């Protein structure tokens, strides 16, 4: 009976091994296809969303549309304008000269969703007469007043043209081909979607591991909805930030990552910072990629050489120099002067350190931000936004606990351990900086907490948190498995040891078959 059982085991063992080999080959094939699959799903969902999302039904879309129109007409930097809109209804408005066709298009498609749109009588009030463009006393423009009208867009004026490169290409094609505003609007969304999908393809392809979890994150509806195609600075910023996270992990986790990959990382990082200046601190993480990776791999590992230092240093210098210059060029106005005037914002800023214990001092700001986080305060007190924001902060809290446990159990090398702590700290700091910016520029002096918070501010940084979670959980599972195996081995009897040694011979059959 025992001999028959042994014979049955001997027959079944090779078939089990071969099935495992086939499964491993299928998984490797799927892993290779993962970038293309993720990009295909994003394109499919993106085109469906473009078809079903009405024009103008995206946050701040009209402000971004006006901003792009102003850049096309020569107003690369915003300037004071006398005109008003639904959101910017008072003084202190800045903007540029926007083509009449785009203004009329926004009026025709205004559905009450985005208050950045101009009023219905805008062209009658500001588009008549023969004055030159830039009717404000301090404004100048290269555009012709017969073709465009000064339009306010404070909340988009802080964005650099880099954030709108895909849409600028669409607007240029539309102008050259004399397309209607409606056709150009859709063209801009399509080009943005293609760029976004390309970035996500490159992001997944750059990963040495965790392609499936990252692909699932990238195709999740919250990330694709709106900001995979929207006419918005946030679309480009989100695409570049997610790509940067994957390239950064690739440079840290792959011992063979060379100068080319490091240069790609810093190039994407500089463009990311130019698209949204609050992401610029992420460039500092590039210095961690300079730490040599000690490995027993047969391939020679990149060392700390002058070219590698120069690549990272140049990226940081360019990124932070652009940040300083752009903030100086755009620091003379506020994003919503009808809610918080420039004078009120400057007073708040000056009191941060002048009166740190006051209501508008440093500790007052910290208390307001803490209150907003604990209560999940959201823009317009949206219950859905509040629940999502609270959930996201809860996820970050759980990730912190997991990271602490993983560090305590030493599942990382010292190099990767420092990296994950710094990466999560910088990413969380960027979210907190966004809270501070909203407290300064969007929250009235008599308000409690922080107004204007939206869960979309978390999404571009989700790639860093996802990869950290994968590394922590995998490391803890390996450590638990190793501990369990060690415990089992220490209690094995001589008979069990003999059986175990026989069973360990089975994989050699698979190796022979694979060879």
What are these regions (language model features)?
Residues 230-237:
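Short acidic/glycine- and proline-prone juxtamembrane loop motifs at membrane-interface regions
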């Amino acid at each position: 009976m025992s001999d028959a059982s042994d014979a049955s085991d001997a027959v079944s063992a090779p078939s089990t091994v071969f099935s495992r080999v086939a499964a491993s080959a299928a998984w490797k094939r799927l892993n290779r296809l993962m970038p293309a699959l993720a990009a295909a799903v994003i394109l499919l969902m993106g085109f469906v969303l473009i078809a079903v999302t009405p024009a103008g039904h995206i946050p701040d879309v009209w402000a971004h549309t006006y901003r792009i129109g102003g850049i096309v007409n020569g107003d690369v930097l915003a300037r004071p304008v006398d005109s008003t809109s639904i959101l910017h209804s008072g003084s202190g408005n800045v903007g540029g000269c926007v083509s009449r066709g785009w203004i009329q298009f926004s009026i025709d498609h205004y559905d009450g969703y985005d208050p950045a749109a101009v009023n219905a009588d805008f062209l009658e009030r500001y588009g008549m007469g023969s004055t030159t463009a830039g009717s404000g006393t301090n404004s100048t423009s290269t555009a012709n007043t017969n073709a465009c009208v000064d339009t306010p867009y404070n909340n988009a004026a802080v964005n650099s043209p880099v954030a709108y490169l895909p849409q600028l290409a669409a607007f240029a094609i539309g102008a050259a081909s004399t397309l209607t505003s409606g056709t150009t609007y859709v063209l801009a969304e399509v080009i943005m979607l293609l760029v976004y999908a390309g970035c996500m393809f490159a992001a997944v392809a750059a990963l040495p591991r965790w392609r499936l979890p990252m692909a699932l994150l990238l195709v999740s509806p919250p990330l694709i909805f709106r900001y995979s195609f929207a006419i918005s600075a946030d679309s480009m910023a989100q695409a570049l930030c997610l790509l940067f996270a994957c390239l950064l992990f690739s440079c840290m986790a792959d011992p063979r990552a060379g100068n080319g990959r490091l240069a790609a990382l810093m190039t994407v990082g500089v463009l990311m910072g130019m698209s949204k200046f609050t992401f610029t601190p992420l460039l500092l993480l590039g210095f961690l990629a300079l730490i040599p990776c000690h490995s027993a791999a047969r391939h020679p590992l990149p060392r700390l050489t002058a070219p590698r230092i120069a690549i990272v240093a140049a990226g940081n210098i360019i990124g932070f120099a652009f940040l300083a210059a752009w903030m100086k060029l755009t620091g003379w106005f506020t994003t919503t002067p009808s809610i918080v005037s420039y004078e009120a914002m400057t007073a708040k800023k000056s009191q941060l350190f002048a009166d740190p214990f006051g209501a508008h001092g440093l500790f007052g700001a910290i208390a307001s931000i803490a209150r907003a986080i604990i209560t999940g305060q959201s823009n317009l007190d949206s219950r859905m936004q509040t629940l999502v924001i609270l959930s996201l902060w809860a996820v970050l809290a759980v990730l912190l606990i997991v990271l602490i446990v993983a560090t305590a159990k030493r599942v990382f090398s010292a190099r990767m351990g420092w990296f994950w702590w710094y990466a999560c700290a910088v990413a969380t700091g960027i979210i907190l900086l966004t809270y501070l910016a909203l407290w300064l520029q969007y929250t009235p002096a008599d308000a409690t907490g922080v107004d204007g918070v939206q869960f979309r501010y978390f999404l571009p940084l989700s790639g860093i948190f996802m990869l950290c979670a994968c590394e922590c959980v995998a490391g803890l599972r390996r450590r638990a498995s190793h501990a369990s195996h060690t415990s089992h081995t220490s209690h094995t009897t001589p008979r069990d040891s003999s059986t175990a040694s026989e069973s360990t011979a089975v994989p050699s059959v698979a190796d022979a078959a694979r060879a």
